[in-house]
Amino acid sequence: MQKISIFLILIFCGTAAGAQLFQPVHYPKTEFRNPLGIPISLSANFGELRSNHYHMGLDIRTRQRVNLPVYAAADGYIYKIKVEPFGFGQAIYIRHNNGYITLYAHLNAFQPALAAYVKKRQYELERWDVFLDVPAGLFPVRRGDLIAYSGNMGGSMGPHLHFEIREFPEDVNLNPMLFGLPIPDNKPPVVRKLAVYDRDRSLYEQSPEFYPVIAAGKHYELAQRTIYTL
């Protein structure tokens, strides 16, 4: 009986500790605004697999145009600026009062005061490609302030704004869709077929069994109501 009691206590303590360790993170839902002045429409989402990396932000369409105004998503100050021929092209990093960083990339131009500062630093450093640490307080921004104009610079395949939210100081990328941005989600997924795998075998040792499905109102069901023996 004593052993059983000790065992139950250990289970309870382990469960309680695990619950405290894996508490859900609640991200602010109202502090960040749409960085553009048009409704958000995505051409690429967070976490998509690319040839050699994961896509760590949102690609927001700019109606196949450049030079749309880009706005600060929240209060803070510009603390880094990047200019490079590939990658982000021209980019702005804003550190916010709430402990996050936002990144705006593939910009066509900076707002005039910022552009003058970048040009001055480029001449001082005698190089075009720069990654500048901007002194804190030199370029404070308020939510909605104009900071740049959208573009197609760097490693971009078409006009858009690449937008990221990161955690400071770890510089960890977070999914911007966790922060309550007004992103329409009105296209339900289309299910074409059901694939069944044998869990006792490796995925590399088998091909799935496919079963046709049909739409039935707001859900899908098997096209043939048959009992399958797997």
Q: Predicted segments — roles?
A:
Residues 18-91, 95-101, 110, 128-130, ...:
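Surface-exposed, glycine-biased beta-strand/turn segments
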Residues 104:
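A cross-family detector of function-defining hotspots
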Residues 4-13:
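Sec-dependent N-terminal signal peptides
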Residues 115-133:
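Intrinsically disordered, low-complexity Ser/Thr- and acidic-rich flexible linkers and loops
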Residues 158-165:
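Histidine-centered catalytic micro-motifs
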Residues 96, 165-167:
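Residue-level signal for short segments within beta-strands and strand-turn junctions
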